[in-house]
Amino acid sequence: MELVLKDAQSALEVSETTFGRDFNEALVHQVVVAYAANARQGTRAQKTRAEVTGSGKKPWRQKGTGRARAGSVKGPIWRGGGVTFAAKTQDHSQKVNKKMYRGALKSILSELVRQERLVVVESFGVEAPKTKELKAKLKAMNLEDVLIVTAEVDENLFLAARNLYKVDVRDVAGLDPVSLIAFNTVLVTADAVKQIEEMLA
């Protein structure tokens, strides 16, 4: 299959297994959920009545004082006592096989092509790290909510895009399923397309 280059009167020959496969919604959902879960820190922690510092002594005798009976100052109804169902540190990470991860990326890329949200250009960059220059370039292409994917890290492009709302720059190595579905349009250079094919082969 071919992808038409927006800035040149030519097309790029690409693999149909990477850019022309059926959309597997269940797989994409599983990988995106796992990716989000793996980003969770999970370091919250509270103390139960067993872990709170304090005496184990009964505060006052069981009968005769007129007060409600109490067996510990560490109970959850006491100020400074433990938490009834205390939150504990958790590992939320989910295992994602390489085959699943690659399959999800291929599925997303194919769907972007079908929806005409994948824009391929011969090359893309800015001469200086100026937001104004990049904004003008994107406006000329009628692009606003866009992820720019380059073959290598382009520092000028990264710095120029840093202050733009709904614009992000990634190299192929930093590509992930969540960033691909987070933007309306994905702008990819021809070199990046070749690298993506090699990575997902």
Curated annotation (Swiss-Prot):
One of its GO terms (biological process) is translation. Transmembrane segments: none annotated. InterPro entries: Ribosomal_uL4, Ribosomal_uL4-like, Ribosomal_uL4_dom_sf. It holds the Pfam family Ribosomal_L4. GO terms for molecular function: rRNA binding; structural constituent of ribosome. It comes from the Bacteria. Residues 45-72 are annotated as: Disordered. The keyword Metal-binding does not apply. Keywords: Ribonucleoprotein, Ribosomal protein, RNA-binding, rRNA-binding. GO terms for cellular component: ribonucleoprotein complex; ribosome. HAMAP family: Ribosomal_uL4_B. Part of the 50S ribosomal subunit. One of the primary rRNA binding proteins, this protein initially binds near the 5'-end of the 23S rRNA. It is important during the early stages of 50S assembly. It makes multiple contacts with different domains of the 23S rRNA in the assembled 50S subunit and ribosome. Forms part of the polypeptide exit tunnel. Belongs to the universal ribosomal protein uL4 family. NCBIfam families: rplD_bact. This is Large ribosomal subunit protein uL4. The gene is rplD.
